[in-house]
């Protein structure tokens, strides 16, 4: 078989990517027990997990950003309310978030790699977004303490070349997530604890 092959010397740069990652946090204290927090962050990811659902064989591969694959970018916005009770023995918070995702990557629906064919020929690129809320309650004082958390989240992807251009749930979408952690302090040196997690 004769084909075009590109070889790079060890340590030779192929493509250079960079991006700013600003983070902004804001807190407003209503009083000594209540506060409101808001935040914004921008993040880049330069290594990507590419998945395919049209094959019976494992096709999840990690690929770096390159001349053909741009870095993934995420913008996240958050807003939360925080409250302490009874001399900070109890804590409660409710947070809402929205995340905008660019340059998401998947395999095309009909891609089957042939001998000598660059795997990059099977990539398709699109956008994603996720949003939801997180509720959290914690008891931190006393012999019996612990915390309870609940997360409701929606994670979507949309590609022009997948699912007729319609949005679809991301592979790792977890709509509901409940976590419970309990600890009982028998004495200063011994305690019993347990954790329960439910996710859909």
Model-derived regions: residue spans:
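Hydrophobic, lipid-facing positions within transmembrane beta-strands of outer-membrane proteins
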Residues: 20-26, 36, 65, 75-79, ...
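Gram-negative outer-membrane beta-barrel transporters
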Residues: 97-100, 117-200
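Repeated loop/turn-to-beta-strand initiation elements of outer-membrane beta-barrel proteins
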Residues: 33-36, 87-92, 143-146, 188-192
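Membrane-embedded beta-barrel scaffold of Gram-negative outer-membrane proteins
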Residues: 37-41, 47, 51, 70-121
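Outer-membrane beta-barrel translocator domains and adjoining extracellular loop/strand segments
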Residues: 2-7, 20, 49-57, 62-64, ...
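Signature of Gram-negative outer-membrane beta-barrel scaffolds
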Residues: 1-33, 46, 162
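Residue-level signature of outer-membrane beta-barrel architecture
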Residues: 18, 26-29, 42, 71, ...
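Transmembrane beta-barrel strands of outer-membrane/channel proteins
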Residues: 1, 38-42, 60, 81, ...
């Amino acid at each position: 078989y004769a084909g075009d092959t590109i070889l790079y010397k060890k340590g030779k740069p192929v493509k250079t990517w960079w991006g700013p990652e600003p983070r902004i946090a804001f807190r407003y204290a209503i009083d000594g027990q209540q506060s409101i927090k808001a935040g914004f962050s921008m993040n880049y990811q330069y290594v990507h997990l590419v998945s395919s659902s049209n094959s019976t064989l494992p096709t999840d591969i990690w690929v770096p950003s390159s001349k053909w694959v741009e870095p993934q970018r995420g913008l996240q916005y958050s807003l939360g309310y925080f409250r302490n009770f009874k001399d900070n023995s109890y804590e409660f918070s409710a947070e809402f978030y929205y995340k905008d995702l660019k340059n998401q990557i998947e395999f095309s629906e009909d891609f089957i790699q042939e001998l000598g064919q660059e795997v990059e020929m099977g990539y398709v690129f699109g956008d994603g977004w996720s949003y939801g809320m997180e509720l959290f309650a914690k008891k931190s004082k006393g012999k019996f303490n612990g915390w309870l958390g609940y997360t409701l989240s929606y994670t979507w992807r949309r590609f022009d070349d997948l699912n007729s251009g319609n949005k679809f749930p991301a592979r790792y979408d977890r709509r509901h997530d409940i976590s419970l952690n309990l600890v009982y302090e028998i004495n200063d040196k011994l305690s019993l604890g347990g954790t329960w997690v439910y996710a859909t």
